[in-house]
């Protein structure tokens, strides 16, 4: 457990957490720390975060004001003819299961991350942007060491990161020579120290020139030569993409009211529609509210069966009703709650949570999808493949609505307990985000687990008719689940497949501490970086 005085941050990489902790120690607020960590994640976690991606930030000010900043991907304003589009299938191998995606420049939607960072800074930041981006510039220029988790990610989706010559040059290193004497290259491995000078230069330029460098000016003309906007427009035009200068120029960060809900003795804030994750979590909690979950021990098979049934009901409601506020209609909830009494029928994201000593809090989830395989020239950053993710674009290559903010499972969340505690959390994990967060919430609120226990407890996830569960479930629970769900997968270890919940809590007395999820190599640091 990490405890801190000025602030606490949990994130998916040591350098990401360190960047935020450094800013907290320098007197920055939670939002400054989150921005610094987000820049660093693009350097240290390039498979999960990129200048070419997007995300969501839940902010809560010490004065009580809360907002969602939506800087997720936007569909292009125009659609090219299918014969012109670069859109190719690829599969990620998690060992015991696979998940399909599509890549190519035609899979890229309008990225929002850079505009979102600047919008958050203008609204909530207290330190100069140059100071916040400084640690990331230094790391990109001086090098970061590849962690085992980052190496594992590359091994899972390696074909994407060697898909183009520019990607191969960036994400591989020389590894001797072949029999003919030609240089041989391999993907980054754990322990490699790698630099990204193009990214360092791009970050430096963004700190000086602002987000217009990435999105272009609002004058309606073509992007100026040498800008990132011009590079993206040219990449898309030449390599089968839909994006053009109008998409970039018109992109805006959207501010929304968080979705608010009550559960037991806690009040929760999470991501509202059009993102789907928060609403589906709210639906699941509303179903659980009619059950005395606290009376079921973690080792009770009935507890796991109830959670699996709630996941199935949520899946069915999403399929039958869509992801709209109608899901929280009391009559609809009663119908699905009654169904729970019946026997059951037979991606890349990362998260940052920060709270400072004044109780300012930020919960940020970002994603680059899996990346489309193409590097934005001059930036050392891969463009997203959001149009190629079936979960948020089920229509595929040419059936998406024009110029629309895309939905997402991402659900940065805050919990306000009646006793004065504040917790911010969120998860990566594509389709598993909502089930990971739901289970951690139940562990915290119903079972009164410590933050570490709640995050590290084994999880289950229902995907279609197949129930997945992690190693560590009591044998009696696993046996009962296997009987109830003939189509199942028992994972031999805790795995990133089940998400990565990084969380920070502020106790009623002001004490700050947090936990990074070991499934995704999570790290938690305080301003003094004093782990105990």
Q: Residue locations for each model-derived region?
A:
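Short, small/polar residue-rich loop motifs at catalytic or cofactor-binding pockets
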Residues: 255, 346-349, 408-410
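Internal maturation/activation junctions in enzymes
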Residues: 290-367, 487
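Internal alpha/beta scaffold segment
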Residues: 95, 204, 259-327, 531-532
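Extended C-terminal subregions enriched in glycine
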Residues: 320, 324, 358, 404, ...
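Noncatalytic scaffold domains of N-terminal-nucleophile
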Residues: 1-18, 22, 30-209, 215, ...
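Glycine-rich phosphate/pyrophosphate-binding beta-alpha loops
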Residues: 269-278, 349-353, 363-375, 427-434
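Active-site rim segments in enzyme catalytic domains, especially the processed small/beta chain
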Residues: 44-50, 54-69, 75, 84, ...
């Amino acid at each position: 457990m990490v405890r801190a005085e000025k602030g606490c941050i949990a994130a998916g990489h040591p350098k990401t957490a360190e960047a935020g902790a450094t800013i907290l120690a320098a007197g920055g607020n939670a939002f400054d720390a989150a921005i610094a960590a987000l820049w660093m994640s693009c350097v240290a976690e390039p498979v999960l975060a990129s200048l070419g991606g997007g995300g969501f930030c839940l902010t809560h000010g010490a004065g009580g004001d809360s907002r969602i900043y939506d800087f997720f991907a936007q569909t292009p304003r125009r659609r090219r003819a299918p014969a012109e589009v670069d859109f190719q299938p690829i599969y990620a191998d998690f060992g015991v299961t696979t998940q399909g995606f599509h890549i190519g420049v035609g899979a890229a939607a309008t990225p929002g991350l850079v505009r979102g960072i600047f919008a958050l800074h203008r609204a909530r930041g207290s330190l100069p942007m140059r100071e916040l981006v400084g640690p990331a510039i230094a790391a990109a220029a001086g090098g970061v060491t590849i962690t085992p988790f980052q190496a594992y990610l590359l091994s899972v989706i390696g074909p994407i990161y060697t898909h183009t010559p520019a990607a191969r040059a960036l994400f591989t290193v020389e590894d001797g020579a072949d029999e003919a004497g030609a240089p041989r290259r391999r993907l980054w491995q754990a322990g490699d120290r790698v630099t990204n000078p193009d990214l360092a230069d791009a970050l430096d330029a963004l700190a000086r020139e602002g987000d217009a460098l990435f999105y272009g000016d609002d004058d309606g003309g073509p992007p100026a030569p040498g800008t990132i906007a011009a590079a993206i427009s040219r990449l898309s035009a030449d390599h089968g993409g839909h994006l053009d200068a109008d998409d970039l120029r018109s992109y805006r960060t959207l501010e929304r009211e968080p979705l608010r809900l009550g559960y037991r003795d806690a009040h929760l804030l999470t991501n509202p529609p059009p993102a789907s994750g928060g609403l589906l979590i709210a639906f699941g909690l509303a179903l659980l509210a009619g059950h005395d979950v606290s009376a079921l021990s973690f080792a009770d098979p009935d507890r796991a069966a109830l959670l699996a049934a709630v996941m199935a009901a949520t899946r069915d409601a999403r399929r039958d009703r869509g992801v709209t506020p109608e899901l929280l209609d009391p009559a609809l909830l009663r119908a699905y709650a009654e169904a729970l009494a019946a026997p059951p029928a037979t991606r890349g994201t990362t998260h940052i949570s920060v709270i400072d000593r004044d109780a300012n809090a930020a919960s940020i989830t970002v994603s680059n999808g899996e990346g489309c395989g193409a590097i934005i020239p001059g930036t050392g950053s891969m463009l997203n493949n959001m149009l190629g993710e079936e979960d948020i674009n089920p229509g595929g290559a040419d059936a998406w609505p024009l110029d629309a903010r895309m939905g997402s499972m991402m659900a940065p969340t805050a919990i306000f307990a009646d006793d004065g505690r504040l917790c911010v959390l969120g998860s990566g994990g594509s389709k598993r985000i909502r089930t990971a967060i739901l289970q951690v919430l139940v562990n915290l609120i119903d079972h009164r687990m410590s933050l570490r226990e709640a995050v590290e407890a084994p999880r289950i996830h229902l995907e279609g008719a197949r129930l997945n569960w992690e190693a560590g479930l009591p044998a009696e629970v696993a046996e009962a689940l296997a009987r109830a769900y003939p189509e199942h997968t028992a994972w031999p270890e805790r795995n990133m497949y089940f998400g990565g919940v990084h969380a920070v809590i502020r106790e009623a007395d002001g004490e700050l501490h947090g936990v990074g999820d070991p499934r995704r190599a999570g790290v938690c640091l305080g301003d003094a970086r004093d782990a105990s």
